[in-house]
């Protein structure tokens, strides 16, 4: 087997969002195909999974972080190392939706740039009767961030794989555009704006 065919690219993904929004449930459903019903606040858990995304094998290193404010400093360290982010809120909690902007701004500050590969995730879409955040609000916020939007249900495994796959696709797009910028030595033609060609996806 050649080196090219045996090489598997690793992607460092970070789950970010308030407490109780289902970050751990999404991660465990993706990694283990199992729904965790009880809520046990996470400090830090790391998971790895190899999968094929768009005909290319990828090793996903997923870091599930604490949503509580007291772990903010620890979370910043994870943000520095992360390549792509899932910004998760619960559609049944307006507070968790409003907190997302704070998490987004924290990543921007830590990364020292306005854009990074990410997907905005509205979780618990199976609880439609308890919805406090409309799908349109999610789409609008994602448009403001310049990222994709998807609604998921860890319990019913709706769009779970797609949420993680979209972050990997975004990392690939971002890296390719960075390479294009690097090769554009004379500044004659800029690489396309990362945020300009994003579209929102919804189940």
Curated annotation (Swiss-Prot):
Source organism of this protein record: Mucor circinelloides f. lusitanicus (Mucor racemosus var. lusitanicus)
InterPro entries tied to this protein: P-loop_NTPase, Small_GTP-bd, Small_GTPase, Small_GTPase_Ras-type
What's the top EC group for this one?
hydrolase
Transmembrane helix as UniProt keyword: no
Q: Tell me the protein's name.
A: Ras-like protein 1
Alphabetized Pfam families for the sequence: Ras
List the GO cellular component terms: plasma membrane
**Signal sequence interval, chain numbering:** none
Q: What GO annotations for molecular function exist for this entry? A: G protein activity; GTP binding
Please summarize the record's notes on activators and inhibitors of this protein.
Alternates between an inactive form bound to GDP and an active form bound to GTP. Activated by a guanine nucleotide-exchange factor (GEF) and inactivated by a GTPase-activating protein (GAP).
Cross-referenced NCBIfam families:
small_GTP
Protein keywords: Cell membrane, GTP-binding, Hydrolase, Lipoprotein, Membrane, Methylation, Nucleotide-binding, Prenylation
Effector region, short sequence motif: residues: 39-47
The record's comment on protein family reads: Belongs to the small GTPase superfamily. Ras family.
Main location (coarse class): membrane
Q: Does the keyword Lipoprotein apply?
A: yes
């Amino acid at each position: 087997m050649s080196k090219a065919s045996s090489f598997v690219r690793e992607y460092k993904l970070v789950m970010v969002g308030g407490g109780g929004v289902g970050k751990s449930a999404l991660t465990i459903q993706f990694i283990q195909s199992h729904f965790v019903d009880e809520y046990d606040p996470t400090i830090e858990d790391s998971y790895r999974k190899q999968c094929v995304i768009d005909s290319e094998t990828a090793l996903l290193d997923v870091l599930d972080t604490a949503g509580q404010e007291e772990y903010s400093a620890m979370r910043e360290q994870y943000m520095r190392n992360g390549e792509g982010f899932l910004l998760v809120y619960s559609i049944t909690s307006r507070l968790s939706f409003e907190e997302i902007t704070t998490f987004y701004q924290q990543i921007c500050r830590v990364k020292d740039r306005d854009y990074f590969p990410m997907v905005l995730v509205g979780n618990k879409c199976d609880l439609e009767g308890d919805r406090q955040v409309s799908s349109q609000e999610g789409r609008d916020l994602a448009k403001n961030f310049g990222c994709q939007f998807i609604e998921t249900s860890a319990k019913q495994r709706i769009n779970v794989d797609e949420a993680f796959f979209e972050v990997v696709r975004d990392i690939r797009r971002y890296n390719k555009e960075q390479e294009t910028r690097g090769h554009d030595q004379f500044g004659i033609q800029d690489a396309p704006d990362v945020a300009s060609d994003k579209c929102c996806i919804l189940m």
